[in-house]
Each structure stands twice: as C-alpha cells, then as structure tokens.
Amino acid sequence: MIISGSGLPLDLPKQTAGSNIKLIPIVSSARALNIIYRKWKQNYNKVPDAVVVEGPMAGGHLGFSFNDVLNNTAPTLEQLVKEVVDFVDTVEETIPVIAAGGIFDGNDIAKFLKLGASGVQMATRFVCTTECDVHDDFKQAYITAKKEDITIIHSPVGLPGRVILNEFTKRVTKGETIPFRCPHHCLRSCNPRTAPYCIAKVLADASKGRLNNAFVFAGSNAYRCTEIVSVKTLINQLKEELSNSL
C-alpha cells in the first residue's frame, strides 16, 4: 500500500504496474481527486483504491495557502469530506474516503463516519504512545504544549506547516539561516540555494530529540495530549468514545 501526498501523483500507477500494491492519494479537495481519478482511469485503467482527505487542521505540511490556514479561511474538513463523498458517489467504482487532519477522539471519528467517510487517519494521538519510535523529547513537546504554542510557519518547500513553537522556530522566523548541502533533492519547490534550512534534516533531527536545531510537526489538537499511553489503551479509548457517539 502506498499513501501518496505532496502533490498530485498523476503517474503513480505507472510506477506500480504489474503489482497488487494499493494506491491511496492524499487530497485537499474534491477537484484534486477528480483530476487524479480521470488521469488514472484514462492513462492506466486504474482508480484510487481509497482516498485520504486531509483538512487544514493537520500537522506538518498543508495543501492550502498560508493565509487561509493562518486566518482559518480554508475549507473545513467537514466541508471537504462532504464534497469528496459527493464526488465518489458519482463514479461507478467504490472508493473509500478516509478523513484526516485534527481528528482527536472517538467523537470526531463518529462525526466523519456520519458524513460518509469509511474511516479516519490519525497521527497526533499516536505520537504520544509508548510504541511510537520518536525520541521521548519529541513526545514531551506534545505533552507540554499549550494551545497557543501550535503555530503555522512558512516551510522551505513553499507550503505552510503546522508546528509546535520552540526556540528554533522563533530563530528561523526572525531570519536565522542554517547553511546546508542538499543530498536529498526531495521536492522541486525547495531551492537549496535560497532555503533558510533543510527541512528534511530538521525533521530527522526532531525525531531524534535534537530540538535545539529542529521543530516538531503537530496537528492542531496536539496540546490536548496529556500522557503517554500504549496503542492498545488508546485504541480501546477511541472505540469506547466512538461507540458512545454512534
């Protein structure tokens, strides 16, 4: 299974031709899914096996304009899920819709299931589990964060990103640069000659707890995490909340 974000993966079926790999694009609009659907079907006789609809409350890089995210003028996840579900209902194939971005508890899960989603994608909650393999300092950034610490930055790749405010974030926001060589060439939109720092290195350092020169990506509800629990405990809690909300 490949879950593909950061742009429209119009040629992805070409890369997996002859395999049974499931292809699941991440989109931020029904229009994006419409384009992917038509191109895949026309060129490869293939449609998405499912689709993740990611809204503006997600952590990390976001598929919306900086101002829309900052000013809360981007479409809500509720609006996006409804639009995508409506589009999927017009095609002959069955394409499960998975809601993502800011989903925190079983009540949220129930809300999106009622809107027609087949499931949800959650990341922030699972950072604060014992099984998550990031450094403990990364997890503690979630536990100690306040609501006002969750902020939006301009990422070097040209997208807004949601992070937890720390000293490194303040420094680079004020214009500090960290020279680097670019071994990755991960995105064309990132120019290593003008980028203030390497986002790939920053994220790798964050996962290892080197937060003096890194920041932590996090969803809009990260500040609501208060403890580290096992995945089993979290799943049981979500199931109970979901059951009570349906």
Residue positions per predicted region:
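Active-site entrance/lid segments in N-terminal catalytic domains of soluble metabolic enzymes
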Residues: 1-91
